[in-house]
Amino acid sequence: MDNQQLPYAGQPAAAGAGAPVPGVPGAGGPPAVPHHHLLQQQQAQLQAFWAYQRQEAERASASDFKNHQLPLARIKKIMKADEDVRMISAEAPVLFAKACELFILELTIRSWLHAEENKRRTLQRNDVAAAIARTDVFDFLVDIVPREEAKEEPGSALGFAAGGPAGAVGAAGPAAGLPYYYPPMGQPAPMMPAWHVPAWDPAWQQGAAPDVDQGAAGSFSEEGQQGFAGHGGAAASFPPAPPSSE
């Protein structure tokens, strides 16, 4: 039974479909199937699957339910995990086992169709996640089997793709290409250090000439600090040199 060709499996390619076309370069394989034709083929395979399962269920006898693909004890234990469940009949785990088997088969077929779309012969986790996202009845599994995020290419953290020209910013934008150039939230961005203008020595002011206006000197100190800290503010003349100690 396991080695038989199932009626809903993919049909082999017709003879001569992969024959090379003379005079057409690169036409050695079969032509690409349009997207709407591919969807029709997938829908036909799913319909054939359920038609075959219906026929198997109608032809099933009592002896067929003695052999199970899934352990009934495990299914019964899961059913008893619900506090509202008191008693379980002998037929209930059998029906649950068959329902779980159909669920696994349909999800596998839908995942395999996604793998074939991507020209792969290996079923991957992303195929299962894509099949869940495409099917409305499987939406309860979206959070359980999330789709894998695209892996970062080498050099994407520096703002350019691997193999690209130096200094070329990635097309994903600054948020995706330059994640390390932004400080964490709540911390100020690094700035260029401003020139520090030290306060005048009180001894200079005490020994200054009596004709020097102290208020003007204080206002000059404030204007000078603002001009230096602003990087390009109005230029101010330097104050007179301190008096000589001689």
From Swiss-Prot:
Gene Ontology annotations of biological process type: flower development; negative regulation of long-day photoperiodism, flowering; regulation of transcription by RNA polymerase II
Residue stretches of biased makeup (Low complexity): 9-21
Signal peptide annotation: none
Molecular function in Gene Ontology: DNA binding; DNA-binding transcription factor activity, RNA polymerase II-specific; protein heterodimerization activity
UniProt-annotated stretches for the region Disordered: 1-35, 205-246
Function: Probable transcription factor involved in the regulation of flowering time under long day (LD) conditions. Functions as a repressor of flowering, independently of HD1 and GHD7. Controls flowering time by negatively regulating the expression of EHD1 and HD3A. Component of the NF-Y/HAP transcription factor complex.
Family, similarity comment: Belongs to the NFYC/HAP5 subunit family.
Subunit: Heterotrimeric transcription factor composed of three components, NF-YA, NF-YB and NF-YC. NF-YB and NF-YC must interact and dimerize for NF-YA association and DNA binding. Interacts with NFYB8, NFYB10 and HD5/NFYB11.
Protein's name in the database: Nuclear transcription factor Y subunit C-2
Naturally occurring in which organism (per UniProt): Oryza sativa subsp. japonica
Gene from which this protein is expressed: NFYC2
